[in-house]
Every structure is written in structure tokens, then in C-alpha cells.
């Protein structure tokens, strides 16, 4: 058996990244899942929020090399679109900004999916009185 070491080219629903970047947002919405399609079509009809407009402007400037500072945003409900690929966006999780490197596989997902708002709890040993066997242990 001969295995190829060449990386598999990225495709989203059969389209390459270059084809996705050339599509209009209406065409892109047609191949998105229902929730993202609804959001995109509503944004096209009613307009993008001010936060999203600022985010898109900064991303386009960063891709041209004119914006050097980290791109920070609170807009966790922004859908990742093809023109955003290759940029690092710092997404607010309620406490801090988490850097998210946007990759082609993330197209169609929301920014908030990659910046978790909760941490996993770290439990220590149970305290005195936490179990029935430790209820009668002296507290000294």
C-alpha cells in the first residue's frame, strides 16, 4: 500500500475556499445550515450590527496589513465567513479576550463557539460534614 502524505484540500459543502470567497452572501447563505442561513438573510435584509460592521472593517484592514493591533470583539454571535479566514480575533468570554485563529474549517460557525464562557470545575477533597461518615468527626 502506498499512502499519500499530501494534505487534503479544504472544501465546504463541495466548494473550495477560493470559490467561497468569490460567492455573494446570498449564494453563501443557500449552502449554510438553517440557523446560519436565517441569520445571514436577516443581516442582509435588516443590516449588520454596529459591532459586526466594526469587526468586518478591522478584519479587512488586518488582511491588507494596515491594522497591527489585536482585533478584539464582543460580537460572539457573528458567523465566520470566508473572508475572515487567516485572521486572529480576540473574542470576549465575559472575563477576558480569548484569541481565536480563524481556520477554513470554522466557516459557518459562530465566533462564540470557540471562546468558552465557563470553565470546568476543579473539585478539592470534601470538607468536614460533607459525607455521613465525616459528620461525627471533631472539627479540631
Swiss-Prot record:
Keyword Ribosomal protein tagged: yes
GO cellular component: cytosolic small ribosomal subunit
GO MF terms, alphabetically ordered: rRNA binding; structural constituent of ribosome
UniProt record, GO biological process: ribosomal small subunit assembly; translation
Comp. bias regions, Polar residues: 131-140
Keyword annotations of the record: Ribonucleoprotein, Ribosomal protein, RNA-binding, rRNA-binding
Region (Disordered): 120-140
Keyword Ribosomal protein among UniProt keywords: yes
SUPFAM superfamilies linked to this entry: Ribosomal protein S19
InterPro entries: Ribosomal_uS19, Ribosomal_uS19_CS, Ribosomal_uS19_euk/arc, Ribosomal_uS19_SF
Pfam families, sorted: Ribosomal_S19 (PF00203)
Family: Belongs to the universal ribosomal protein uS19 family.
General function of this protein: Protein S19 forms a complex with S13 that binds strongly to the 16S ribosomal RNA.
Protein name: Small ribosomal subunit protein uS19
Organism: Nanoarchaeum equitans (strain Kin4-M)
